[in-house]
Design a protein with these regions (language model features):
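Catalytic adenosine-cofactor/nucleotide-binding cores of aminoacyl-tRNA synthetases and other
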Residues: 1-260
Length: 260
């Protein structure tokens, strides 16, 4: 580093030696993540980490497994450049750059963590097929079909008192755990400032596991259209975030979470 350079130069000048060329560069640091190879290896050996692609590590393998596009890292390093001082990288910056690449390619799907089966009392609309675009900005990709007959799975965290709109389906009133039909139109939902939440069909769903960036796991149900994916595909779970399909195990899809 610079201090040692001055000391070495003083010694070389004093001894009459040719002063070598000094090359200085700073270290790259990331917030709240392990970049030390020795510490990562020790953690892998003692079982703290599952491997070099554990989501808690800052290795290229780890961030690629989560769905961070290679162009994001290239653009980030190019923007930072070579500096003598250390540089700190924030996840907020990485996610912001990566979102530019994922947003146009990631199709949208529903996922409900810790799903709870609900039945809408007073609903008389019969069974209908709800069509929702895979991507609102790319209508040429087609629609997903979500069957609805008055029952659905909701994320446990979304079941609170108030008026809610099940996306593109119906508006419901939740009062003390009792769920009743309120109305159907989006205009009605907007007039009462209803919160809009995702849901998963009772008759067409698949088990989903999402490995988060801290290695914790979210489990739940996703819509049946997820079965059309292949390993490596990146999706956006509405109201949850971007995730990369890592493994298809029996009838369970295992994703790695990228970011919101």
């Amino acid at each position: 580093h610079l201090a040692n350079t001055e000391k070495q130069k003083y010694l070389y000048d004093h001894m009459g030696w040719d002063v070598p060329e000094y090359i200085h560069y700073g270290r790259l640091k990331m917030e709240d993540i392990a970049l030390s190879t020795s510490k990562a290896m020790a953690g892998i050996e003692d079982g703290t980490y599952s491997g070099w692609d554990d989501p808690r590590l800052g290795t290229l393998r780890a961030i690629a497994r989560r769905g961070i596009d290679p162009r994001t890292i290239y653009n980030l390093i190019t923007e930072i450049g070579v500096k003598m001082a250390d540089s700190a990288i924030s996840w907020k910056k990485i996610y912001g750059l990566n979102r530019n690449f994922l947003e146009p390619v990631a199709n949208r799907y529903f996922f409900c963590e810790d799903p709870q089966l609900i039945t809408v009392g007073g609903y008389e609309g019969g069974k209908v097929d709800i069509e929702r675009p895979l991507h609102a900005d790319h209508m040429d990709r087609g629609n997903r079909i979500l069957p609805f007959d008055g029952s659905a799975y909701l994320a446990k965290s979304d079941i609170n008192d108030g008026i809610f709109r099940l996306m593109d389906a119906v508006n419901v009133n939740i009062d003390g755990g009792e769920i009743t039909y309120h109305s159907t139109s989006f205009e009605d939902a907007r007039s009462v400032k209803a919160r809009i939440i995702q849901w998963v069909p009772v008759d067409d769903n698949v088990d989903v596991k999402i490995v988060m960036d801290d290695a914790s796991i979210k489990t739940g149900l996703g819509e049946g259209a997820l079965r059309d994916l292949k390993v490596g595909d990146i999706v956006q779970f509405e109201r949850v975030g971007f995730a990369r399909l890592d493994e298809i195990a029996d009838d369970e899809l295992i994703f790695y979470f990228a970011h919101k």
